[in-house]
Amino acid sequence: MSETQNHNSYGKPVEMTVIGAGSYGTSLAISLARNGANIVLWGHDAEHMARLDADRANHEFLPGIAFPDTLIVETDLQKAVQASRDLLVVVPSHVFGIVLKSLQPHLRADSRICWATKGLEPETGRLLQDVAHDVLGDSYPLAVLSGPTFAKELAMGMPTAISVASPDAQFVRDLQEKIHCSKTFRVYANSDFIGMQLGGAVKNVIAIGAGMSDGIGFGANARTALITRGLAEMSRLGAALGAQPETFMGMAGLGDLVLTCTDNQSRNRRFGLALGQGKDVDTAQTDIGQVVEGYRNTKEVWMLAKRMGVEMPIVEQIYQVLYQGKDARLAAQDLLARDKKMER
C-alpha cells in the first residue's frame, strides 16, 4: 500500500486535493481527473458541494461539463487535506490566508502546497508566499501555478499551457509530471517564484484598464498600447522585487496579460468595459456575478508599487477610478497627457 493510501479513507490513492470549488478550481480538478487520476475537490459551501456531487457537474460555473468518475467531491476538510500529499489551493486572494489557516491543523507531515490564486495580500500588498510563510512557517514546500487559463476552456479539454514555480526543484518536477497529464494541457517549469506570483496580480489590473479603454471606444491601438505599457509596469515592479525579467515574457506574464486583456471571458476585462461605458464600480461588480479579482488587486498592486518606489502610471489611474471616483475618460486623458519620455 502506498504512502498516500495509508493517509486517506477512500480506499484508493489520491493524486491531488483541490481546495476551492469555484470555476477555476473545478476546472483544474476536472482536467486532472480526466486522465484517470483520483482527485479530491473540496469547497466550503456544503450546499454547493452537495449539488456538485448529486449532479456530477458544476452547473453554476461550468454548465454542461460532466465530472470524470475519478473526481471525488468532498465536504470534510480534514479528509480532503489528508487524502493526498499535494494540495492545490484555488481560492480568491482576499481569503487565501484564511483558507491556509483552516488547512494548517489538518496538514500531513509530508504535505506540499501549491496555489493557483492570483493576487496579493489585501491591505498590505504582500506576495502570497509571505502570507503562506506567516501561517505555515518553513515546514512545507510551496509552489505557484499561473498562466493564461480560462476555466471553461480548460474544463472542456481545449489546448492550454501554464507554468509552475517553486523554490523546491523536486516539487516543481513532481507538479509538472502530475498536472501535465494530457495532450491538451501543457505545464512549463519555472524557477522564478516571485515573478510568477506577481504576474498574476498585475495582469488583472491592466485588464481592467484595457476593458475601460474598449468601453470608452478607443479601439485596438489604445488597447495594444495599454497592454504593452502594462507589461513594462509589471516588469519594473518585478525587477524591484528581484524577479527574473524573462518571466514576464512567459506564460505568467505576457501570456496571461494578453489573454485577460483581449477576451470577454475575463471578468476583469468585462468589469473595465462596464466602467468605460459609464457604470459605477458597485454596479459593474454586481453585474459580473462572480469575484472580480482585479478590483482588490488594483489596491494591492498600487500599495506595493508605492512601497517599492516603482512608477506605475496605468495602475495609478485605475486605482483612482476604482477607489477615488475618478471618471474613466479623465483617467485616459491624464495618461495621454503625461510628459514625453523614452520608452523603457
Swiss-Prot record:
Binding of NADPH, residues: S23, Y24, H44, K118, A151, R267, V291, E293
UniProt signal peptide: none
Positions contributing to sn-glycerol 3-phosphate binding: K118, G147, T149, K203, D256, S266, R267, N268
Primary localisation category: cytoplasm
Top-rank EC class of the record's enzyme: oxidoreductase
Pathway per the UniProt entry: Membrane lipid metabolism; glycerophospholipid metabolism
Keyword field: Cytoplasm, Lipid biosynthesis, Lipid metabolism, NAD, NADP, Nucleotide-binding, Oxidoreductase, Phospholipid biosynthesis, Phospholipid metabolism
Gene Ontology biological-process entries: carbohydrate metabolic process; glycerol-3-phosphate biosynthetic process; glycerol-3-phosphate catabolic process; glycerol-3-phosphate metabolic process; glycerophospholipid biosynthetic process
Active site: K203 (proton acceptor)
Intracellular or extracellular location(s): Cytoplasm
PROSITE patterns, per the entry: NAD_G3PDH
Assigned GO CC terms: cytosol
One Gene Ontology molecular-function label: glycerol-3-phosphate dehydrogenase [NAD(P)+] activity
Family: Belongs to the NAD-dependent glycerol-3-phosphate dehydrogenase family.
Biological role: Catalyzes the reduction of the glycolytic intermediate dihydroxyacetone phosphate (DHAP) to sn-glycerol 3-phosphate (G3P), the key precursor for phospholipid synthesis.
PANTHER family, A to Z: GLYCEROL-3-PHOSPHATE DEHYDROGENASE, GLYCEROL-3-PHOSPHATE DEHYDROGENASE [NAD(+)] 2, CHLOROPLASTIC
Protein's name according to its UniProt entry: Glycerol-3-phosphate dehydrogenase [NAD(P)+]
